[in-house]
Amino acid sequence: MAQDDWWLCAPEPGMLLWARLRLREDTGAEVLESSGLTIRFDDLDTGRHYLLGADYRAFDGLDPEDAAALGFELGDLAPPAAPDGPALVRRMTQRLR
């Protein structure tokens, strides 16, 4: 079974981009970006380093101060969910109110 971790970045005020880091059953990893691009890596650590280098932060590692710095309340946001890939990608770019 695959394991998903969600990451986000704020490229400009009022906008969030999500990325999904998935650990595959074969111990490889893949990142699904908000553009719909999927990038495969040999392992989870390489995928994490890729996201960190692109200024993403792990959603499960955010605290209220981190969230405020990105422009949202931690309790008001959850990773995107959708029944299929194209619908998920459409939800991976969010405008904040």
Where do the model's predicted regions map?
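N-terminal functional modules and adjacent low-complexity/disordered segments of proteins
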Residues: Q3, P11-E12, L16, A67, ...
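Intrinsic-disorder/low-complexity coil detector
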Residues: A10-E12, A78-P79
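Mixed-charge, Lys/Arg-enriched low-complexity segments
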Residues: L44-R97
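Residue-level signature for short turns and capping positions that connect secondary-structure elements
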Residues: G36-L37, T46
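Negatively charged, low-complexity tracts enriched in Asp/Glu with abundant Ser/Thr
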Residues: M1-A10, R97
